[in-house]
Amino acid sequence: HSFVYEKLFSLWNTILYVCLIWTLTVVATVPNFFVGSLEYDPRIYSCTFVQTVSSSYTITVVVIHFILPITVVTFCYLRIWILVIQVRRKVKSEFKPRMKQSDFRNFLTMFVVFVIFAFCWAPLNFIGLAVSINPTEVAPKIPEWLFVVSYF
């Protein structure tokens, strides 16, 4: 694996990865300026994405930045879990060397990070979806404490 790692994370590739991340960040942020959805919110003492500016834009942001990635990663983890279960069953029946404990521990750690990510970002995104349904009616009904907690 060290040869693959050295090829994937060479100096040139690492510079490209950093540039790609910054480009994607700019591409994700620029539409906010055209929609006018960035405003100072005194509840969280920060400039943030205002979910009541445009329902269709809020839905698009939530789908592209939360629901789609969560769906793809969930699908991938389900496939990995199925593979792990199949390998464990096969190993037990054939008495072959089992899966490395460190590989399984690494997989489990990444899975926990994903679950924590989803758990932390879900409230804000679900509030955004709820607000986008009917901003004038739903937004005032969301308790301020819930909105503030969803940011932290």
UniProtKB/Swiss-Prot annotation:
Keyword Cytoplasm: no
Extracellular side: 34-57, 132-144
Matches recorded under Gene3D superfamilies: Rhodopsin 7-helix transmembrane proteins
GO terms (BP aspect): G protein-coupled receptor signaling pathway
Membrane topology (UniProt): Multi-pass membrane protein
Molecular function as annotated in GO: G protein-coupled receptor activity; melatonin receptor activity
GO CC annotation, single: plasma membrane
Transmembrane segments: 13-33, 58-78, 111-131, 145-152
Residues in coiled coil: none
Organism: Xenopus laevis (African clawed frog)
Job description of the protein: High affinity receptor for melatonin. The activity of this receptor is mediated by pertussis toxin sensitive G proteins that inhibits adenylate cyclase activity.
Family label: Belongs to the G-protein coupled receptor 1 family.
InterPro entries (alphabetical): GPCR_Rhodpsn, GPCR_Rhodpsn_7TM, Melatonin_rcpt
Keywords, in A-Z order: Cell membrane, G-protein coupled receptor, Membrane, Receptor, Transducer, Transmembrane, Transmembrane helix
The keyword Cell membrane is assigned to this record: yes
Ranges in the topological domain labelled Cytoplasmic: 1-12, 79-110
Cellular compartments annotated: Cell membrane
Main location: membrane
Name of the protein this chain belongs to: Melatonin receptor type 1B
